[in-house]
């Protein structure tokens, strides 16, 4: 399994008690995180979070199987994608905005996407009305929940045009027809 593959380098971690440890694979990183460890150096915190995100994505991808039917074969990351995607993908930076987003049906309604820059068939940037932008990347396709229908695993990176805020999230999305809206099967 991918979680136990050695990265070829070590990430130094520590916890508030002063205890330190080095990890070099997803399995050890995940265990250390659950035990309260974080990046030993403040400037490596972003890398620590990115590694956790990537490890979880690999773990979720490992659950994919061959699908019998697909309603995402013609999926395009374009201006319409946010209109068919749940508000769970919205750019949320506070508990208050999270509560508001939950009441809205689509990502587009939550973030008011103003423009889209398509980088490739599997990657696009979405710019919202408040100076935020999200990069969506389709990383895998397959049957996630054993219903025979093809699902997609995506990664979402949130950033702001002026400032230093950033966050990363992963999702498994599905839909039951070519025109149907997507639903979230898993989120991390």
Q: Where are these predicted regions, by residue range?
A:
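Acidic carboxylate motifs that coordinate Ca2+ or other divalent cations, activating on Asp/Glu
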Residues: 147, 151
């Amino acid at each position: 399994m991918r979680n136990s593959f050695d990265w070829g380098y070590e990430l130094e971690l520590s916890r508030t008690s002063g205890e330190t440890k080095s990890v070099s694979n997803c399995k050890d990183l995940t265990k250390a995180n659950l035990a309260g460890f974080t990046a030993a150096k403040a400037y490596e915190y972003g890398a620590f979070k990115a590694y956790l995100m990537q490890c979880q994505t690999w773990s979720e991808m490992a659950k994919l199987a061959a699908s019998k039917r697909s309603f995402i074969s013609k999926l395009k990351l374009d201006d319409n994608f946010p209109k068919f995607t749940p508000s769970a993908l919205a750019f949320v930076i506070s508990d208050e905005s999270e509560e508001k987003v939950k009441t809205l049906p689509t990502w587009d309604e939550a973030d008011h996407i103003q423009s889209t820059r398509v980088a490739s068939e599997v990657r696009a940037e979405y710019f919202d009305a408040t100076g935020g932008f999200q990069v969506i990347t389709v990383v895998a396709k397959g049957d996630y929940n054993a219903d025979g229908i093809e699902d997609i695993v995506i990664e979402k990176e949130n950033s702001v045009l002026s400032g230093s805020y950033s966050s990363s999230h992963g999702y498994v999305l599905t839909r039951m027809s070519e025109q149907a809206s997507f639903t979230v099967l898993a989120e991390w």
